[in-house]
Amino acid sequence: AISAAEQAVRDAQDAVSRAQAELAGANATLADAQSKLVAAQSAKDSADAVLAAAQQNKDAADAKAAAASAAYVQAKADLAAAEAGASGPEYDAAKQKVADAEAALAAARAVQSQCESELEQVQSAAATAQTELNDAQASLSAKQQAALDAASGVNDAQSALDAANSDLDAAKQANAD
């Protein structure tokens, strides 16, 4: 009875060692998941900042294009008025003003288009960063659960070891009596 109880104690000690090794592994994996989450959060924050800047650039380009469009409309109105009764030089100046306004409008629209394209790319990058952050959070939750399960396994193994030691003590006591 004593040798069987001693074997049970050894088996229980082995089980505790295995459970502790599993817990150590789970904790290492958890630490890795936590650092990945921190990195993903940082990448998301950075992407959000770039997105905000791109949105500001787009808004500014929209405003400039609107102003250039208004200036072009005004220049065409001035040209129409000059056609009605201005002298040659005034008419030529009004025509030049329309040409300049047209060029400025084309340039503003090109910038506007480029800003829009950049904004779309940045929005895509921000969406990817959000997806990666969500994945990292889900992974961390799973690793936390695994670590909790491993800790529970250590407790269960320790309880089994305590019970095996009690049985061994009882067998030794019975043998002594």
Q: For each predicted feature, which ranges?
A:
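Extended amphipathic alpha-helical heptad-repeat regions
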Residues: 1-177
